[in-house]
Amino acid sequence: MKSIRTRLTLFFLLICVGCLAIAMAVSSIFSRSALTDTNDRLHEQQAEYYASMIDSWLQENTGDVDAACTFLEAKSLIDEVTIRPVMEQYTNNNVNAINVNVGFENKLFIDGTGWKPEAGWDCTGRPWYTDAKAAGGEKYFGDPYVDAVTGELIISVSKMFHTGSDMEGVVNMDLKLSTLFDMMNEITDTSDGSYSFIYNENGAILMHPNSEFISTGENVVNVSDLIGGAYEKAMTSQRAFTDYDGKAKYLKAATVAGSGWKEVLVTPVAAYNSAANEMLMVLVVVTVLSSVIAAVLVILYAGSITKP
C-alpha cells in the first residue's frame, strides 16, 4: 500500500509540477516578447522626444535667419545704411548667436558685429554661402568648428533669399551650441547608465559624453568611424553592441526634423532588459511556491485515497 501511495504521489506531483513549468515557460516567452516590444517603443519615443526638443531649440534660436530673409526679400534697393542696423539688432538680441550677417551676389557683405572685411574678400566663396545656395532656400546647418575667441563649438546656419529686385543673397548666423548641450544634459535620463549623442547630416559628431568623439574644425569625427562602425551597425541591425566602455548596449536614433541631425539614445542592455528580467524572476518564484503547495496537496490527497 505504501508503494502505491508513493507512486501515486510522484505521479500526480510530476503532472502538477510539469504543467506549472510548461505554463511558466509559455507565459515567460510571450510576456518577455510583449515587454521587449513595449520597451522598444518606449525608447524610440524617448529618442523622438529628445529630437523634438533639439528641433524646437534650433528653430527658436535660428528664427532670426528666417526673419532677416523675409526683411531682405521685401527690399528692392540694397542699402547698407538701413541693413546694417537690422543685422546688428539680430546679433545683439540672440544670446546664442555670435553674429548674424548677410552676403550678396555682388560680394557686398554686412556683418552684425560691425566687422568689415578687407578689400578683395569674397563672401560668395565661403562655405556658408555656397552650401545655402545648394540647399535651395532651406536653412542649411553647417559642420561644427571651434570659435578662436571663445573656444566654443559653433555651426553656421545659412539661408538663401532673393531681394525684390531679384538680387541673390544669403543670411548667415554663427550659432553657439553650448546652451543646447546644457539643455540635453539636463533632460536626458542618465540614472540607468544611458546617454545621448548628436551628429549632423554629414555624420559629424556634435555632442557626446566622450570628449574625444566630438568634432572640431580641424578634426571632424564621423559617426561611421567610431568603435569600428559599431554605432551605425547597431542602428541598422537593432542589436546590442559593445560600446567604447566595453559594456553591451542598445541604441535608438531619431531624426531632428528641421536640420537632418540625428539624436541617438544609448542604453545598457542590463537596464534595457531589467523589466523583463524582473518579470521572469516573479514567474520563477510563483512557480516554485505553486509547486510546493501542489506537492503538499498531492501528498495529502494521495494519502487519503490510499488508506485501507
Where are these regions (language model features)?
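Solvent-exposed, extracytoplasmic
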Residues: 80-93, 170, 174-214
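Extracytoplasmic/periplasmic ligand-binding sensor regions of membrane-associated signaling proteins
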Residues: 92-96, 110-187, 241-243
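Cytoplasm-proximal transmembrane signaling helix
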Residues: 12-17, 262-264, 269-308
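Extracytoplasmic/periplasmic sensory segments of membrane signal-transduction proteins
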Residues: 41-48, 53-138
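GAF sensory domains
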Residues: 110-120, 206-225
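Juxtamembrane interface helices immediately C-terminal to a transmembrane segment
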Residues: 9-10, 27-57, 79, 272, ...
